[in-house]
């Protein structure tokens, strides 16, 4: 109810396009930037590091394909796990059709990805590691910090699908060695059709 009350004015009288310059648009833009600042604050990120999407699937899709495209000069190898969300797995399969190589890591009986397995899977041409923060089926919290440290040591970008974990466990992109993080509003009582990607230390295309 609280979320609905906050949204109602922008679905009724304050319905301006946030990308335009007229009055209603400016009001909407201010609301959008306030939301961006709020999301950034929960992650200890900068507002400029928050990119809004239409949901968790688009966030995952954008993160994986964007990194693959922007860093293909470095290599075309991606590391992920076999239990990722379909948004990740389907993006990886799409990239395989374009000539990328993807290593799909196994997990243990608890659904845990081994940081050691990640380490040994890294190659000279590895550009991205993408491992979920929390599993949507069994609830396993993955060793994101350890995997992120390995990624940093090996100079490989690290994305985590945190759709299931954001707003449930404390996450700071300033303390976690994570380059990109996906989230979705409907998992924390927000509206459906809204997601975000936080990206730190990176300059990426957002159109």
Residue ranges and their predicted role:
Residues 160, 164-166, 172-189, 195:
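Conserved active-site segment immediately N-terminal to the catalytic lysine
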Residues 103, 107-165:
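Active-site phosphate-binding strand-loop segment of PLP-dependent enzymes
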Residues 1-20:
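N-terminal "arm"/small-domain region of PLP-dependent enzymes with the aminotransferase-like
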Residues 67-89, 101, 106:
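Conserved PLP-anchoring active-site segment centered on the Schiff-base-forming lysine
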Residues 18-58, 62:
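Conserved N-terminal alpha-helix of the aminotransferase class I/II PLP-enzyme fold
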Residues 199-206:
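Conserved small/polar residues in nucleotide/adenosyl-binding loops
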